[in-house]
Amino acid sequence: MMTDKLNLNVLDAAFYSLEQTVVQISDRNWFDMQPSIVQDTLIAGAIQKFEFVYELSLKMMKRQLQQDAINTDDIGAYGFKDILREALRFGLIGDMSKWVAYRDMRNITSHTYDQEKAMAVYAQIDDFLIESSFLLEQLRQRNQYD
């Protein structure tokens, strides 16, 4: 079992940036006044930030599991769903199926660009913010500096 604390600064900053982007886009009066190219760029930026926060979340989830594990070699060999199962068991996440769905969302946007698919992914970012906020709070609690 390791005792080093995780540095959550990058995840904190990325999460905050995504959250603020979604808040700005949610201001319908402001958003509707923007030219369509700006609207598209803002949505694309939010999706890219989602992808980044998602990837960072998984990395931090895995690192925390390595911190908590008795045998860290086991965690290193785990596949994606194994990581999620352990994260659920350790209380880092609340709903494994949502994290599987987020991976599917990330795969959709990273392999092709289709406006309809992009909007479907964007529509799920609010839910992702709730789930990733839960993860971030669990990570903060486990990595408090005295």
UniProtKB/Swiss-Prot annotation:
InterPro entries: HepT
EC number(s) stated in the UniProt entry for this protein: 3.1.-.-
Motif (RX(4)HXY motif): 106-113
Enzyme class, spelled out: hydrolase
Modification note: Modified by cognate antitoxin MntA; probably at least 2 successive AMPylation events occur on Tyr-113.
Keyword Nuclease belongs to the record: yes
Keyword 4Fe-4S: no
Catalytic residues (UniProt): 106, 111
GO MF, any single term: endonuclease activity
Pfam families: NTase_sub_bind (PF08780)
Modified residues (O-di-AMP-tyrosine): 113
Keyword annotations from UniProtKB, A to Z: Endonuclease, Hydrolase, Nuclease, Nucleotide-binding, Phosphoprotein, Toxin-antitoxin system
Main function: Probable toxic component of a type VII toxin-antitoxin (TA) system, probably an RNase. Neutralized by cognate antitoxin MntA. Neutralization is probably due to AMPylation by MntA. A mixture of HepT and MntA binds nucleotides; the highest affinity is for TTP, ATP binds more tightly than ADP or AMP.
Protein family per UniProt: Belongs to the HepT RNase toxin family.
Subunit structure, as described in the record: Homodimer. Forms a complex with MntA, probably with a stoichiometry of 2:2.
Name the UniProt record assigns to this protein: Probable ribonuclease HepT
Taxonomic source organism: Haemophilus influenzae (strain ATCC 51907 / DSM 11121 / KW20 / Rd)
